[in-house]
């Protein structure tokens, strides 16, 4: 799930119930088959919970709020529900959450101006290396800052119905614009920091949402972000989504991988 920050309406000084969650990749399209060979499905037992990104044969990168002790992954999938000949399944031998991630906010779905979801990043060490094939391929980490205004591609199996939270059958893609962090700072009451990216459409209609957490944000062909959190209903005007900014974490990622071969 993308970390959805539920909007709690204030009424007469009190807090009302949150509105229905509008949960899906909004304004997206079915990804071309095998066009995202680095995209990974992350599970808790047999329940799909998040996306992820294959960095090399042994390592998957995802969001820290996707953490469960029972995580496992599937690679080479297009259809979330069907067993495909291309699919590979791996257990997770160890999880490495970024030490700066505030786990006290883990799965806390309310809004507060002091909440800071920075460092929402986790590495998963696979119990057995993935077989690198035409449909299972790693993607490189960024070496340069992303450019504002870039066209970015996000992908995921996020929910396709607003109330039943039913995940998409086929991997979905959506094109988003990389926006100034100030836009997200104005849009959300939670803290938007320099280790985050802001992406969406000012007019709304395109967004990632519940079920897309941990998946890639690829800007001008380069992996730049990991889907982290955002507003619900998803795809609202002037409510772009927030992504973990990977260029800020390449040293931690590389060091963690090197020390845990």
Swiss-Prot record:
CDD domains membership: Tryp_SPc
Family stated for the protein in its record: Belongs to the peptidase S1 family. Kallikrein subfamily.
Assigned keywords, A-Z: Disulfide bond, Glycoprotein, Hydrolase, Protease, Serine protease, Signal, Zymogen
UniProt GO molecular function: peptidase activity; serine-type endopeptidase activity
SUPFAM superfamilies registered for this protein in UniProt: Trypsin-like serine proteases
Signal peptide bounds: 1-18
Annotated glycan sites: 102
Residue ranges annotated for the Peptidase S1 domain, each copy included: 25-258
Lineage top rank: taxon: Eukaryota
Name by which UniProt lists this protein: Kallikrein 1-related peptidase b9
Gene name tied to this protein: Klk1b9
Pfam families per the UniProt record, alphabetical: Trypsin
Catalytic activity: Preferential cleavage of Arg-|-Xaa bonds in small molecule substrates. Highly selective action to release kallidin (lysyl-bradykinin) from kininogen involves hydrolysis of Met-|-Xaa or Leu-|-Xaa
One GO term of the biological process aspect: zymogen activation
Active site positions, chain numbering: 65, 120, 213
Disulphide bridges: 31-173, 50-66, 152-219, 184-198, 209-234
Enzyme class: hydrolase
EC assignment: 3.4.21.35
InterPro entries attached to this UniProt entry: Peptidase_S1_PA, Peptidase_S1_PA_chymotrypsin, Peptidase_S1A, Trypsin_dom, TRYPSIN_HIS, TRYPSIN_SER
Protein's organism: Mus musculus
Propiece residues: 19-24
Protein function: Glandular kallikreins cleave Met-Lys and Arg-Ser bonds in kininogen to release Lys-bradykinin.
């Amino acid at each position: 799930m993308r970390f959805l920050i539920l909007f709690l309406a204030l009424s007469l000084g009190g807090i009302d119930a949150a509105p229905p969650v509008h949960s899906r990749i909004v304004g997206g399209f079915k990804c071309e088959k095998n066009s995202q060979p680095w995209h990974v499905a992350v599970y808790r037992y047999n329940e799909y919970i998040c996306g992820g990104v294959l960095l090399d044969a042994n390592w998957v990168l995802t969001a820290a709020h996707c953490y469960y002790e029972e995580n496992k992954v599937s690679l080479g999938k297009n259809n979330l529900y069907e067993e495909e000949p291309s699919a590979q399944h791996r257990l997770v031998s160890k999880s490495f959450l970024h030490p700066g991630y505030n786990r006290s906010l883990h799965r806390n779905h309310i809004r507060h101006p002091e909440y800071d979801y920075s460092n929402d990043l986790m590495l998963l060490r696979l119990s057995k290396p993935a077989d690198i094939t035409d449909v299972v391929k790693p993607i490189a980490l960024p070496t340069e800052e992303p450019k504002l205004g870039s066209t970015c591609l996000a992908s995921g199996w996020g929910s396709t119905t607003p109330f039943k939270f039913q995940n998409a059958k086929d991997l979905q893609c959506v094109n988003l614009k990389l926006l100034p962090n100030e836009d997200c700072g104005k849009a959300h009451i939670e803290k938007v920091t320099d280790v985050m990216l802001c992406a969406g459409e000012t007019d709304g209609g395109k967004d990632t949402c519940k079920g897309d957490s941990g998946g890639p944000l690829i800007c001008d062909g380069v992996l730049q972000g990991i889907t982290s959190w955002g507003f619900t209903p998803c795809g609202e005007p002037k409510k772009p989504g927030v992504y973990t900014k990977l260029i800020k974490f390449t040293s931690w990622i590389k060091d963690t991988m090197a020390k845990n071969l």
